[in-house]
Amino acid sequence: MSEQKSMQILNEADTAQYIGMSRAWLRLARTRRIGPPYIRIASSIRYAVPDLDKFLETHRVTPKQITRN
């Protein structure tokens, strides 16, 4: 028998808390296709934690270093 990797899956409420956004934003982001990847099982929406981590990393902004004379 082969081993399967376990992936943590979150519902919409837990996802909103995980990424610091509202559930309403997640719904809007899904309709506009600008949010994190999601899994649809029947009428349930779920998010994989590795996908959320990647989504957050791609939106990281690193400010430029200010040099003073």
Say what each PLM segment does.
Residues M1-L28, R40, T58:
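Polyanion-binding surface elements
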Residues E12-A16, I45-R46, D51:
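A broad helix-preferring feature
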Residues Y38-I45:
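Short Lys/Arg-enriched helix C-cap and helix-to-coil transition segments
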Residues P50-N69:
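A short, Lys/Arg-enriched interface patch at domain edges and termini
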